[in-house]
Amino acid sequence: MAIKIENKSTIKLPRKTEETIQSVFDVVPKEHTRGLSKVVLVDRVIPDTRIQMPSNISELPGIYHPKMGNAQPFCEIALGTLLSADGWLKRIAARLNFRPNLAYLALSLQAQHYHLTLSHGIKKNQYEGAIRTYIDRYHKIWREQQAGWRAKLFKPIQPLLDKWVRKLKKRYAAEQKRK
């Protein structure tokens, strides 16, 4: 079952926005999205009176609304934060990075839903790490499915690049330890 996407935004969406969100939710197992009713696209996140939140909530790119009473859980994505309107260069950069940022945000909201409602045995102080690893795992799968010719070209040398990155991180940590 596809998750319903409601567009309540006045901002002009980049093309294939809804397809991107659906492709992200297609990567995640269906059991993990059970109970999540919809994804709402809005201009800015509006504070919910049912939940205590900080004052700078309007700058958040998205928020997960858990089940409360009869209201089903849903996700809210603020397009005004993802699509910057500040300057010409920032607008271009925001448009170029929109799909991966939207995918990562949708995965993070879905991971919050999974870990808060369906996953058991995780303590409150362990949620952030568990959600981050969950997002990274499924974002990598989504990226590989969306990959073009460049990713297919670099796929054979990816283990070599990963080994090189680990070696550089180790060297950097050793230098920081010496200082």
Report each predicted region and the residues it spans.
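Short active-site segment of divalent metal-dependent hydrolases/proteases
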Residues: 107-115
